Structure formats: structure tokens, C-alpha cells
Amino acid sequence: MSQRKFFGTDGIRGKVGADQMTPELALKLGWAAGRVLARTGTKKVIIGKDTRISGYMFESALEAGFSSAGLNVLLMGPMPTPAVAYLTRTFRAEAGVVISASHNPYYDNGIKFFSNDGSKLDDEIELAIEAELEKPLICAESQFLGKVSRIDDARGRYIEYCKGNFPADQTLSGLKIVVDCAHGATYHIAPAVFRELGAEVVAIGVEPNGMNINDKCGATSMGAIRDKVLEVNADLGIALDGDGDRIMMVTQEGDIIDGDQILYILALDAKERGLLKGGVVGTQMANLGLELALKDEGIPFARSKVGDRYVMELLKELGWRIGGENSGHILNLDHGTTGDGIVAGILVLAAMRRSGKGLQQLIAKLKMFPQVLVNVRFEGDKNPLEADTVTAKVAEVERELGERGRVLLRKSGTEPLLRVMVEGEDKETVTRLANAIADAVKAAT
């Protein structure tokens, strides 16, 4: 495969005004993508965004680029990433575009694409777009320019889609739920979804100002929702990230429920209903406790590289339907084509209603193992992963842990860091062993 210059594993992302995230690039990207997408299909593209102040700028630039290439543009305004994927399918658009940096701070932004079926763009199309980016921008003749319009009912369409994932014969009546929207794209969606299903909703993180997205709130900062759940004596809390593709939850007692625990709930619910097709895909960072608990239930488990793109690839390869990351990206291919925080929350609530159990009860048999992560900075060209002393230390630690523990070493993709992760049943033992490996890494650099 050719080397990518712009696209990463999840589109293009960076600090606004620096890196690659400039209005100039967005304009050219819209034109280049338009040139590729206009070769076939409906010549129609959808653009959605989160609530970052820079979204206006990038939306206008992309809009101009697509129009100059002859594509018609449908604008959604602030909408969750999974909503763009869904509406791209229902509008029969050639592609969907999301302007978001997901869980990052407001001063970052990004651009990612969905294909006409709501999945991530194929590598071949991304490479074709990159090839067009190298060419000079040539505007289409006036009679072939694209038009721009707005989808006025995008919010209502997506709310109804989300509600459709909950059993029609059930309601959430009697449940008090705190919903934290991270001042992001779900601020006008998620509270309405759960209210219309019958829950009493206490909404926080629903006052975006362009600069407070993910700021001490949402799925990456659980303190605010935990405090609110305890303050109002809610039955549970649902925290989403800035673009709505991640979910974390909080029990009535204030315990944090992460993506691994949500996967466990969804897998057991699907198994009990005879709907589990195969097993569950997690990542290299998935807790060993999840793997062992699923094994006890006779459910196969497979690990992919970190990143929802790789989870999706392995799901398709194995023909399975449920997968995700401990960070809260949850994929259920029977209910969508991408990670959807609101829908994942609805599926957990449906499992609660069917079982008659509370959130804490649903994970009672899942024993999460302590994980210790140590970041070791290294300099120079040496790869500490190849050092004999490091390899020997890892082997020694793995022997001590046996089948009830795990070691993972991986290099950061953005910094000169080696991440040492050790997990096992005892926190003190795991900490000691992680530090021992970290010391071996330091000595080898």
C-alpha cells in the first residue's frame, strides 16, 4: 500500500491552524474528495460537525471545495458522528463527512469520511483522494457547480433512529438517568432520546460555547457525571464524548463502567436471546478479566490492534457482530455501522429491562483485573523492544503471572514512548512487575 501523507487511521486530525488542519487544506480536500466521488454515484455528500468553534470555518471550506468539484452538499450542522454515518445511508449520499476531533480539546479538529454504506472509506479511495490533493485545483464550469442545502430535520430523523433500537413494548419509565453530553454534538439529541423513551433525565454538558467541548466533562472526564449521579440519587449515568461515538457509564453507587464492561453486558444479553453471532472482539488493551469472564460463559474472544477501525476489520474478518474498546467505542453491527454512544446506551438499558437487573448486577460475575501502565521515554534509534534484556524480563514476568495475567509492550505512534502494561489479579504484584519491565527498558536505551 502506498504511504499516506494526510489520512491517519481515523481521517485527518491536528491542532487548528497548525499541522494539517487549515482552511486551505479543507478547501482542497473537499475538491479532491469531490473529484474522486463524482466519478460515480449520486454526486451528493453530507457534512456534519461537532460543536468546536472552528467547525464553522472548516464546514464552509469543505462546502466550497465539494461545490467546486461539482458535488451537491447537504449540511447537517452539529450532529454526532454516528448520525452522519446513518444519514449518509438513508439519503443515498455518495459520502458523509464529519468535522470533529472526537474526545480531543476544542483547539484540535479533524475531518473524516464515511462511504455510502456508512462505514469508513476504503483505503483505495483515501489514496485516490490523496493523489488528487497533489494536483492544482481546477474549478468545474459554472453549469456543473454543486448546490448546497440544509437537512432541516436531521435531528428528528436521528432521534427516531436511536429510539428504534429499544424494544417497542418497553419504556424507561421509573428510571432516573444523568446524561453528560460533553458540551458536544449530542447536546440536543441524547437527552431527548432518553426522555422520549420514558426516563427522567438530568442533563449536563449541554451548553456548548465552541470552546468547552470535552472540558472536564463527558466520557473522558467522569468526575462530573459521577458527582451528579450521587447528588440526584440517579439510577445510572451515561457519559458521551464530544462527537458521540464513545460511551462510559456510572452505576447508582458511583462506580465507573467502561467499554469492556459494556461489551460484557451486550454479549451476555445477545447470547441469552440467541442472537450472538460468534464471539466478541476487543483490543490489545482489553482487560483480561473480560476475556476470562466471556470464556466462562462459552463466548469466544479475539483481540485486534487498538483503534475502532481495527476492531471493525476483525469483526468483518471473523463474521462476528459485537466489538469495541475499553475507552468506550462500542460496535454492534446489528445496530449500525460505526461506534454509537447513544445506541450502545440504549442497548444496555434494554438488557436491564429484559433481565430486571440493575447496572451493577449485570456485571456481578465480571472481575476486572488491575492494570498498571508505565510510559518509558527513550531516545535515539535503538528499539528497546528488540533488546535481549527486555525480552528476558518480559518472559520472566509472564512466567510469574501465568494464565492469570498479561504483559503488553507497545510503542507510541506519536511520541518516543514505550508503553508497558501489566495486568493480573493483585495490584501490588502487577505494579512491581510493571516497574521491573520499565527499569529493563530504561537500562536498554
Curated annotation (Swiss-Prot):
Keyword annotations: Isomerase, Magnesium, Metal-binding, Phosphoprotein
Amino-acid positions noted as binding Mg(2+) in the UniProt annotation, renumbered to this chain: 102, 241, 243, 245
Cofactor binding description: Binds 1 Mg(2+) ion per subunit.
GO biological process terms on file: carbohydrate metabolic process; peptidoglycan biosynthetic process; UDP-N-acetylglucosamine biosynthetic process
GO cellular-component term (any): cytosol
Function: Catalyzes the conversion of glucosamine-6-phosphate to glucosamine-1-phosphate.
Cofactor(s) this protein cannot do without: Mg(2+)
Family classification: Belongs to the phosphohexose mutase family.
UniProt name for this protein: Phosphoglucosamine mutase 1
Enzyme Commission number, as recorded: 5.4.2.10
GO MF, one annotated term: phosphomannomutase activity
Positions of the catalytic residues: 102
Modified residues (Phosphoserine): 102
EC main group: isomerase
Catalytic reactions of this protein: alpha-D-glucosamine 1-phosphate = D-glucosamine 6-phosphate
PTM info: Activated by phosphorylation.
Gene (UniProt): glmM1
